[in-house]
């Protein structure tokens, strides 16, 4: 079995330009191997009101080792007052893909 060393960190932003900027920052900084950027519709409670807004979901593919640096970079550049960050464990099903993620986030590469 392949070790579950990969994680997917997700967050949302309100503007496509912000999503693209965070995605590029993460990949250029070698904190994420890849980022999926998707338009979504969110329904949530904020300051006592139920709101519905278009947002952009970002799914960052990274490793356990690079996760702390990725999170710090995103917190420093996220446009929201209270951004949501959460992770999903990712167990790669092929060693080739696992190695690609590992190589892509290796700061010495």
Model regions: which residues?
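Positively charged, small/polar-rich N-terminal and surface patches that mediate targeting and assembly
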Residues: 1-109
């Amino acid at each position: 079995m392949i070790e579950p060393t990969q994680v997917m960190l997700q967050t949302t932003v309100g503007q496509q330009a912000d999503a693209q900027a965070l995605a590029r920052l993460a990949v250029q900084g070698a904190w994420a191997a890849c980022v999926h950027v998707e338009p979504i519709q969110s329904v949530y409670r904020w300051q006592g009101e139920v709101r519905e807004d278009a947002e952009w979901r970002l799914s960052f593919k990274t490793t356990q080792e690079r996760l702390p640096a990725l999170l710090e970079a995103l917190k420093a550049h996220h446009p929201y007052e209270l951004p949501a960050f959460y992770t999903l464990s990712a167990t790669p099903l092929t060693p080739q893909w696992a190695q690609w993620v590992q190589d892509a986030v290796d700061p010495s590469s």
